[in-house]
């Protein structure tokens, strides 16, 4: 079990998948949201939670005022845990899409998001994450001002952000590194 840190569901516990996932620690999640909310008010934002795992990042965003979160998770057991967590918390605005992150991002959208949260398994190659970041921009997921946060192991190669993103200072918490960037201009 882990818990929601802040907002209307703050302090409530949520389930985590039984094996094969590495939920973001409370400390890292709290720091992540402190960094983002120092620059952006979450109220009313549209959020994309990639490699959602337990859904903790997206649920934290909903608890703190985001209008909507699209959770993307390929593992069926993890997706079932996300669905149960959404129901247990009773937060509106949650949509769960079961499927591979690369396929969902490649399919595109006509509704860009304001915040992208990505916590890929540490064994996902940095080049694959780089490709996802590039596809977000070319497939309509981002707009000027979109913020992206990617959680990686400190042992993983740093990300190569596509043109049009301004990196924010990265943060390191033990063996976890947060890489953040802001979209400078609309999709091309």
Swiss-Prot record:
It is an enzyme of class 2 (transferase). Changing residue 183 to A: Shows reduced nuclear localization. The keyword Kinase does not apply. It is found in: Secreted; Host cytoplasm; Host nucleus; Host nucleus, Host nucleolus. Its EC number is 2.1.1.-, 2.1.1.171. Can complement rsmD-deleted E.coli cells. This is RNA/DNA methyltransferase Rv2966c. It comes from Mycobacterium tuberculosis (strain ATCC 25618 / H37Rv).
């Amino acid at each position: 079990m882990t818990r929601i840190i802040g907002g209307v569901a703050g302090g409530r516990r949520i389930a985590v998948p039984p094996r094969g996932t590495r939920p973001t620690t409370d400390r890292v999640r709290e720091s992540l949201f402190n960094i983002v909310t120092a620059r952006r008010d979450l109220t009313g934002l549209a959020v994309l939670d990639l490699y959602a795992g337990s859904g903790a990042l997206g649920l934290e965003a909903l608890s703190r005022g985001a209008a909507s979160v699209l959770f993307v998770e390929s593992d069926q057991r993890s997706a079932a845990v996300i669905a149960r967590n959404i129901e247990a918390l009773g937060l509106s605005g949650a949509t769960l899409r079961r499927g591979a992150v690369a396929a969902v991002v490649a399919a595109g959208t006509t509704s860009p998001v304001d915040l992208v949260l990505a916590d890929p398994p540490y064994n996902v190659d940095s080049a694959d994450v780089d490709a996802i970041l590039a596809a977000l921009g070319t497939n309509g997921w981002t707009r000027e001002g979109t913020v992206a946060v990617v959680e990686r192991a400190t042992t993983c190669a740093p990300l190569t952000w596509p043109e049009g993103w301004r990196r924010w200072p990265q943060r390191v918490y033990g063996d976890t590194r947060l890489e953040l960037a802001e979209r400078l201009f609309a999709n091309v």
